Amino acid sequence: MAVVTIRQLLDCGVHFGHPKTRWNPKMKRFIFTERSGIYIIDLQQSLALIDKAYDFVKETVAHGGTILFVGTKKQAQESIAEQAQRVGQPYVNQRWLGGLLTNFQTVHKRLNRLKELDLVDFDDTTRGFTKKELLIQRRERDKLEKSLGGIRNLTKTPSAMWVVDTKKEHLAIDEARKLGIPVIGILDTNCDPDEVQYPIPGNDDAIRSVALLTRIIADAAAEGLIQRHQKPDAEGSAPAEPLADWERELLEQGDAAKAALPVEENDVDAEVSAKNEAKSDDEVPAPVHAPESDDATEAKIEAEATEAEAAPATTGPVSE
């Protein structure tokens, strides 16, 4: 079942692209037609790619991963914060700080500082701080809250990243590519589809379009959270994150080779054992005589004993 219909995409204006003068030739395969100098995006392809991205996000979250929502343009700030908070995922809807992913250790120290300042009562002057010092700390906290408030609970780099407007968020995409973090993003007709692993062709400028696509990704994360909590955790181990494509292929090849080896051995063993049984049946000689009864055996023993008694005993040394 599709997570969204073409009618919903049309109503939100997802199909509207940029004017012909602002386009990337790499997006040609996603363009349906051109009307009044504006490119129209092929929503059939968008629908299929939405389903693919939805499944990826759901599986990522179900296996314990996190999705970082990124959208700093005005049209996306509200929906990014709202949907990310709804499903408990980190988000960045203000300015992207350089090194937020590639220099996460330093960012994590600032997050700890933010948590320390959250515990400070700025109206209490009886703790040894002057009013000026409390005012400076309050301003520091407000600044950190604005820039890092959305990722305060992020303890490691995210498993994947949802991006609105890949051209504007090029710094975030560059850092994600350096760390091998998959990117799901809205691709307008002026974007480069090679920059993201899970592209969704659509309008990244209209508020309704951005809100709809962001809500779909959040719904996928919510479904993944439900699956994560429903999974029995008998061993008490932390859920594993999804494997990379090359790791998955390597694992499948190893499983296939391991499964094929016992089957071949079993076939050979069965064939050899069948031959041995047939050969043993042919080589077993027929019995020469029937086994003697107990009475016949006793009579034979008595006869041998009588013959031994009747034989003369030898006395003295035997002459040479």
From Swiss-Prot:
Family, similarity comment: Belongs to the universal ribosomal protein uS2 family.
Annotated stretches, region: Disordered: 254-320
PANTHER family reported for this sequence: 30S RIBOSOMAL PROTEIN S2 PROKARYOTIC AND ORGANELLAR (PTHR12534), SMALL RIBOSOMAL SUBUNIT PROTEIN US2M (PTHR12534:SF0)
Keyword Ribosomal protein: yes
Compositionally biased spans, kind Low complexity: 308-320
GO MF term set: structural constituent of ribosome
Biased composition range(s): Basic and acidic residues: 272-282
InterPro entries to which the protein is assigned, alphabetical: Ribosomal_uS2 (IPR001865), Ribosomal_uS2_bac/mit/plastid (IPR005706), Ribosomal_uS2_CS (IPR018130), Ribosomal_uS2_flav_dom_sf (IPR023591)
NCBIfam families, alphabetized: rpsB_bact
UniProt-recorded name of the protein: Small ribosomal subunit protein uS2
Pfam families in the cross-refs: Ribosomal_S2
GO cellular component labels: cytosolic small ribosomal subunit
One GO term (biological process): translation
Keywords linked to the UniProt accession: Ribonucleoprotein, Ribosomal protein
Keyword Ribonucleoprotein: yes
UniProt superkingdom: Bacteria
